[in-house]
Amino acid sequence: MPDIFIGTDLVEVSRIRSAIDNTGQRFLDRIYTKSEQEYCQSKANPAIHYSGRFAAKEAVMKAIKSSGFQDPIPFCAIEVQSKDSGEPVVILALNQDGYCTVSISHTESHAIASAIFIPG
């Protein structure tokens, strides 16, 4: 059976909303890919969706780092896309082979994500 690594992250929507309000596009470009920005901006409350994506990226980083991967992981090296069904899909642009999946949930005030990473 392969090793399985798990990561979880919880984000306050107000913190992400403040980061966007205070640093604007600079923050968005450092954390989110263009595709992620387009997705979040298409929603009625973008901050909630940015928060979910942020939590997902953090959860993925934690799962990958717990596998022993030591290189820095830029936020934009982890892209969270959505299938037509709404299911999130993780795209990794790292020098690390493996399979990663994530689950995201949110309320008006918080977003949470859990990730599973299986090295390849």
Mark where each language-model region is.
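Core catalytic alpha/beta fold that binds nucleotide/phospho-ligands
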Residues: M1-G120
